[in-house]
């Protein structure tokens, strides 16, 4: 297993400090990894990949963790997603597994707001866009939604547009 970077160790420390209710062995925190994605406009996105066993604890303590992380990494838009690489053990990605990864990462990237649906718009033979629709009460700015779309593109390789779903009662 590769060693963690200084930033990964720092994020792991923040999670340990603010999510005391996580009952996981200390080595689980060593599986936290970070992927940096830089948008066309120069915005930097830090995608923190956390093991499944602690993701729920991160989400339960999200406001405290994100506040502490932004104090240390103020130049980044930070999001937490499930670390499938830590679970995979080098297995090849099947089509079913790829679909599961996409569905989970879509929901994780939009947290703390609810993903109400997706819609794929086909514009041409090799040109399609996946519209990620969030609950109407979302308070994300247009820039934050664009950052989530760019992060998903960096993670999954498809074009994503994140927007509010105005057609639901949420």
From Swiss-Prot:
Compartment annotation: Cytoplasm
Residue ranges the record marks as coiled coil: none
Chief localisation class: cytoplasm
Keywords, comma-separated and alphabetical: Cytoplasm, Ribonucleoprotein, Ribosomal protein
GO cellular component: cytoplasm; ribonucleoprotein complex; ribosome
Subunit structure: Component of the small ribosomal subunit.
Family the entry assigns: Belongs to the eukaryotic ribosomal protein eS7 family.
Identification of the protein by name: Small ribosomal subunit protein eS7
Top-level taxonomy: Eukaryota, Fungi, Fungi incertae sedis, Microsporidia, Unikaryonidae
């Amino acid at each position: 297993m590769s060693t963690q970077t200084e930033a990964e160790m720092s994020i792991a420390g923040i999670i340990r400090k603010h999510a005391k209710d996580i009952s996981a062995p200390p080595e689980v925190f060593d599986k936290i990894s970070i992927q940096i994605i830089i948008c066309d406009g120069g915005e930097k996105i830090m995608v923190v990949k956390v093991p499944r066993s602690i993701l729920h604890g991160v989400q339960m303590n999200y406001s405290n963790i994100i506040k502490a992380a932004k104090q240390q990494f103020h130049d980044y838009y930070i999001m937490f997603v499930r670390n499938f690489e830590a679970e995979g053990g080098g297995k090849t990605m099947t089509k079913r597994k790829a679909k599961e990864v996409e569905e989970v990462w879509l929901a994780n990237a939009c947290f703390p707001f609810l993903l109400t649906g997706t819609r794929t718009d086909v514009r041409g033979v090799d040109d399609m866009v996946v519209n990620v629709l969030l609950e109407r009460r979302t308070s994300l700015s247009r820039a934050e939604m664009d950052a989530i779309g760019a992060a998903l593109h960096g993670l999954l390789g498809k074009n994503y547009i994140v927007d509010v779903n105005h057609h639901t009662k949420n």
